[in-house]
UniProtKB/Swiss-Prot annotation:
Pfam families (UniProt xref): PGK
Enzymatic reactions: (2R)-3-phosphoglycerate + ATP = (2R)-3-phospho-glyceroyl phosphate + ADP
Subcellular location: Cytoplasm
GO CC terms in record: cytosol
Alphabetical keyword list: ATP-binding, Cytoplasm, Glycolysis, Kinase, Nucleotide-binding, Transferase
Disulfide bonds: none
A biological process term (GO) from this entry: glycolytic process
Pathway(s) where this gene product acts: Carbohydrate degradation; glycolysis; pyruvate from D-glyceraldehyde 3-phosphate: step 2/5
Name of this chain's protein: Phosphoglycerate kinase
Source organism of the structure: Synechococcus sp. (strain CC9902)
An MF annotation (GO) of this entry: ATP binding
Length: 401
């Protein structure tokens, strides 16, 4: 069901109105407390600027870290407010707590176009319990609700789901709208051939996605540490590579399901091996049928890269989730980098390339190719759940278009 978006509200609807905007400002900090990557803050700017331009009073709600329902001084949103002020070119006032007298006073003093950032909503235990009393107090600070936090949309919390019961309209922000358009679109109405590239170390964390994608895709390419569970299930020796023994039957079932559906399921034909898990480990390339004892696979091999590139060449939509190897180690980053480069190339020829959150995003950014992708998702768990076909509570709660 399509959701109503911020684009449907004009200045007449918003001028002078207090708009509660749930944003995803869960950014990484270094030991000195400085923000090391402000991507998520910048991703919310189109929505914030639109509201400011329409004369709304913008009240931002966000979580940061996992303070477990109590105040944690290291998890205050102070550095976020400072960075947001720089990006907007205007003062962003931060409250001492997300509800209560200070928040009420600062929101009450707002002029049209002002921006207030409420303190970390997870300092209140009731946030993650989706407590309706807390949701009502948050909602009392506003007249309209906008959810632009796709990365938190798979959680039914007070600030993502509960507040919608008290605020109308409740609409999707521009970032949320773009995420749904690309990810939902890729699953529901893709241009074909549709391929999914699934990587990462564990089959267990990607089971739901693999099952759902085998149902929907024409091709599924698998890389990362999880390939060794598939090889072992085929009866191959995998040395000391990572294997999930309790998922061997599942690996067989997934291969059988793909075959029965006529889906091309590709596993690497060769791998880059290491004698230990380290950036400077000794390495060698081996066919997957000839992995020696005492060695572990840390990347897909050069032959596998060529096979994967050939499989992707004619695709019109590609979803990528999870690296091909341990790309944090330069020696074992070739497979992941090759996929990033290939997606940039086919994207230039009209293929829709979607990077589905998590480590793939870091890989594409490390390769300097982020700008060449059609869409880079800001959600990790949320993207996976959407691709699995699950209903996201934070999306379901919004007004229908």
């Amino acid at each position: 069901m399509a959701k109503r978006s911020l684009a449907s509200l004009n200045a007449g609807d918003l001028s002078g109105k207090r708009v509660l905007v749930r944003v995803d400002f869960n950014v990484p900090l270094n030991d000195a407390g400085a923000i090391t990557d402000d991507t998520r803050i910048r991703a919310a700017l189109p929505t914030i600027n639109d509201l400011v331009g329409k004369g709304a009073k913008v009240v931002l709600a966000a979580h940061f870290g996992r303070p477990k329902g109590q105040v944690n001084e290291a998890m205050r949103l102070t550095p976020v407010a400072a960075r947001l002020s720089e990006l907007l070119g205007k003062t962003v006032t931060k409250t001492d707590s997300c509800i209560g007298p200070d928040a009420e006073a600062k929101v009450g003093a707002m002029a049209n176009g002002d921006v207030v950032l409420l303190e970390n909503v997870r300092f209140v235990a009731e946030e993650e319990k989706n407590d309706s009393g807390f949701a009502e107090k948050l909602a009392a600070l506003a007249d309209v609700y906008v959810n632009d936090a796709f990365g938190a949309a798979h959680r039914a919390h007070a600030s993502t789901e509960g507040v919608t019961k008290f605020l109308k309209p409740s609409v999707a922000g521009f970032l949320m709208e773009k995420e749904l358009q690309y990810l939902q679109g890729a699953v529901d109405e893709p241009k074909r051939p549709l391929a999914a590239i699934v990587g990462g170390s564990k089959v267990s964390s990607k089971i739901g996605v693999l099952e759902a994608l085998i149902d929907k895709c024409d091709k599924v390419l698998i890389g990362g540490g999880m390939i060794f569970t598939f090889y072992k299930a085929r009866g191959l020796a995998v040395g000391k590579s990572l294997v999930e023994e309790d998922k061997l039957e599942l690996a067989k079932e997934l291969e059988a399901k793909a075959k029965a559906k006529g889906v091309e399921l590709l596993l690497p034909t060769d791998v880059v091996l290491a004698d230990n898990f380290a950036p400077d480990a000794n390495s060698q390339i081996a066919d997957v049928t000839a992995i020696p004892d005492g060695w572990m696979g840390l990347d897909i091999g050069p032959d596998a890269i060529k096979v994967f590139q050939a499989a992707l060449a004619d695709c019109k939509t590609v979803i990528w989730n999870g690296p091909m190897g341990v790309f944090e180690f330069d020696k074992f980053a070739a497979g992941t980098n090759a996929i990033a480069t290939t997606l940039a190339e086919i994207g230039g020829k009209g293929c829709c390339t979607i990077i589905g959150g998590g480590d793939s995003v870091a890989a594409v950014e490390k390769a300097g190719l982020a700008e060449k992708m059609s869409h880079i998702s800001t959600g990790g768990g949320a993207s996976l759940e959407l691709l699995e076909g699950k209903v996201l509570p934070g999306v379901a709660a919004l007004d229908n278009a």
